[in-house]
UniProtKB/Swiss-Prot annotation:
Organism taxonomic ancestry: Bacteria, Pseudomonadati, Pseudomonadota, Gammaproteobacteria, Chromatiales
NCBIfam families (alphabetical): PRK04366.1
The EC number(s) this enzyme carries: 1.4.4.2
Residues passing through the membrane, by range: none
Summary of the function given for this chain in its UniProt record: The glycine cleavage system catalyzes the degradation of glycine. The P protein binds the alpha-amino group of glycine through its pyridoxal phosphate cofactor; CO(2) is released and the remaining methylamine moiety is then transferred to the lipoamide cofactor of the H protein.
One BP term from GO: glycine decarboxylation via glycine cleavage system
Record flagged with keyword Metal-binding: no
Cofactor names: pyridoxal 5'-phosphate
Keyword set, alphabetical order: Oxidoreductase, Pyridoxal phosphate
Name by which UniProt lists this protein: Probable glycine dehydrogenase (decarboxylating) subunit 2
Species annotation: Thioalkalivibrio sulfidiphilus (strain HL-EbGR7)
Length: 496
């Protein structure tokens, strides 16, 4: 039930003082409302109960296991939140001069340096992108700016493997490139012959995730980097899966020229629900002139923002100020808590947990998409045979998992694996939690074989069960209040 449906005329949390004409006398007539604002009217208790009930329906990492593949739903240490909310940080205004922001700027400079060190991007890091997708855009925009500066306008193509993150082709297109898809071979690696055939004078670069979304490490990455560079292109690294190699392997050492990092994933800042995010970008020396601004510089013992005057070839600003400051501070605290010795342990335990769950699920009878490969931080189970034999699909299994108080893994992604579940346990989960998840999956598999209708009817314990997904897509209702969309159409004289 929406809060508007709980509204009762005349009910309110506080008494409203009568409006005096003198209060609005200076307000032009065209800005004065002719009718009451269409806001819900409830008592304070009704409002508190409404939102408390909604919060109790939420699924979060604070309450249950969240193995959502390629999303790195790890626990966010509370110390990161507490320190990021110190009064000195909260009270700083974005327009405050550098001289009044030395503590904040020092943290941002150190964060840039730590990210540069752990990724091997020697040209530097910019923290200004406010989401992973914006970081992607910044990365490809820098590739474009690099070629444009060299007047190499023939380079109109970006190569994207078919196992890439779904946003990669969209990003390349937004930057004005034509996308060429590169197939994956049977072992989960980039098809090298197809790559060689695609490279040429029109190649601007290639977008890669390593480990890939298939949950395997691209074993011939150095050869790929050499081939792309020999063809005159650049390598973009999608940092979606950086958690698997943190402190172990550096993208810069693999030959990448630009990387975006999801600080809201790998570096444990809260995410989900649309934000806030942080998509910091790191570059090699050749792309440093094109970095998005502002970037924090250290001069002696003082810190300042570098602007257009310092980087005249910059692709420009991507946020009004300097990125999501609160998210960046949380990532900074997280990295300081881990230290140089702690970062490799993130990769070690995330891959250990993934391989443990993968091995146990295989023992329980689940089919792996790439049985001959070790998992990195995530892996893929394919239910194509189960669906053929029982008509129980990956979506059915995902729905049934909700009844066991586990969030479903990512379903039907990546697209090239049929009936797939992409499972990422992260490094912060205990063996007991992982064992419980495995047993739940095994029980669902047995149900699918003996009582398929039970699985196909799930979930049974949720406030909402199965939705009419076709109707939801065709009769979209995302208005801010019931009937609002129709009212606005009528007011503007538009027709459906």
């Amino acid at each position: 039930m929406l809060i508007f449906e709980r509204s009762r005329p005349g009910r309110g949390a506080t008494a409203q003082a009568p409006l005096r004409e003198a209060t609005v006398s200076g307000l032009p007539e065209r800005f004065r409302r002719g009718t009451r604002a269409p806001l819900p009217e409830l008592s304070e208790l009704d409002v508190v109960r409404h939102y408390t009930r909604l919060s109790q329906k939420n699924f979060s990492i604070d309450t249950q296991f969240y193995p959502l593949g390629s999303c790195t739903m790890k626990y966010n240490p509370r110390a990161c939140n507490s320190l990021a909310m110190l009064p000195g940080f909260l009270g700083r205004h974005p327009h405050a001069p550098d001289t009044h922001s030395q503590g904040f700027l020092a943290c941002m400079f150190e964060l840039q340096e730590m990210l540069r060190d752990v990724t091997g991007m020697k040209g530097g890091v910019s923290l200004t992108p406010m989401a992973g997708a914006q970081g992607e855009f910044a990365g490809v925009a820098m590739i474009r700016a690099y070629h444009d500066a060299r007047k190499d306008t023939a380079r109109t193509e970006i190569l994207v493997p078919d196992a890439a993150h779904g946003t990669n082709p969209a990003t390349a297109t937004m930057c004005g490139y034509t996308v060429k898809e590169i197939p994956t071979d049977d072992s989960g690696d980039v098809d090298m012959e197809a790559l060689k055939a695609a490279l040429g004078p029109h190649t601007a670069g290639i977008m890669l995730t390593n480990p890939s979304t298939l949950g395997v490490f691209e074993r011939r990455i150095k050869e790929i980097a050499d081939l792309v560079h020999q063809a005159g292109g650049l390598l973009y690294y999608d940092g979606a899966n950086l958690n698997a190699i943190l402190g172990k392997v550096r993208p810069g050492d693999m030959g990448f020229d630009v990387i975006h990092m999801n600080l809201h994933k790998t570096f444990s800042t809260p995410h989900g629900g649309g934000g806030p995010g942080a998509g910091a970008v790191g570059v090699s020396e050749r792309l440093r002139p094109f970095m998005p601004i502002p970037v924090v510089a250290k001069e002696g013992e003082r810190y300042r923002f570098m602007t257009e005057k310092d980087l005249p070839q910059s692709i420009g600003r991507l946020s009004a100020f300097a990125g999501n400051a609160g998210v960046l501070l949380r990532a900074y605290v997280y990295m300081r808590m881990l230290g140089r010795a702690g970062m490799p342990r993130v990769a070690e335990f995330s891959t250990l947990n993934a391989n443990y769950v993968m091995a146990r699920l295989r023992e329980k009878g689940f089919e792996l998409a790439f049985p001959g490969r070790r998992a990195t931080h995530e892996f893929i189970v394919t239910l194509k045979r189960l669906a053929k034999d029982t008509e129980v699909t990956a979506m059915d299994v995902a729905k049934r998992l909700l009844d066991f108080n586990y969030h479903a893994p990512t379903t039907y992604f990546p697209l090239l694996v049929p009936e797939c579940l992409l499972i990422e346990p992260t490094e912060t989960e205990s063996k007991e939690t992982l064992d419980g998840f495995v047993e739940a999956m095994a029980e669902i598999l047995e149900e699918a074989r003996t009582s398929p209708d039970k699985v196909k009817g799930a979930p049974y314990t949720q406030p909402n069960r199965r939705f009419d997904e076709v109707r939801a897509a065709r009769e979209l209702d995302v208005a801010w209040r019931p009937g609002a969309a129709l009212d606005e159409v009528a007011e503007q004289g538009r027709t459906d």
